[in-house]
A protein has these predicted regions:
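N-terminal nicking endonuclease/strand-transfer module with a His-rich metal-binding environment
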Residues: 1-143
Length: 143
């Protein structure tokens, strides 16, 4: 299994990327948590992006609030459900699982390898910045 932390962003570009994959039929939104005030049938790329921007504005000191991660395996070694379970454990160990933390998890079907993408904010529900010290090292240790 490979977990890759993808580039952060001030504008939550990962949402548009993943939603474009959904529109093309090569990805599925597996899970959306804590997207308050939006019914899932009302989700659009722009509404989701705006939600994450508004949520992240709780801490104006964080310039690139997007946290975007890909979790993949060789072929079909893990099902998307197993990758989803791995993603939840990963988020907890990395500090992104506080109650109220918004997140989107997408399953991608555009390569021979099962993989998912996670999009969340580096801002915790109480407004503090989620610790990112030694993030890549900690991420490697989890896998």
């Amino acid at each position: 299994m490979i977990i890759t932390i993808l580039p952060s962003s001030a504008n939550f570009h990962a949402i548009a990327y993943n939603e474009m994959k959904v529109e093309k039929g090569v990805a599925t939104l597996l899970e959306a948590q804590n997207i308050l005030g939006l019914r899932q049938e009302a989700y659009t790329p722009e509404k989701l992006r705006q939600y994450f921007l508004d949520y992240s504005s709780r801490n104006t000191h964080i310039q690139n609030a997007q946290f975007h991660v890909a979790v993949s395996c060789k072929g079909n070694e893990y099902t998307h459900q197993q990758l989803l379970d791995i993603a939840h454990r990963y988020l907890k160990e990395m500090g992104y699982a506080e109650e109220g933390q918004p997140l989107l998890i997408y399953a991608h079907h555009d390569t021979p390898n099962n993989h998912i993408h996670i999009v969340t904010s580096r801002v915790a529900p109480d407004g503090h910045k989620i610790d990112h010290a030694h993030e890549k090292r900690r991420s490697r240790e989890i896998t």
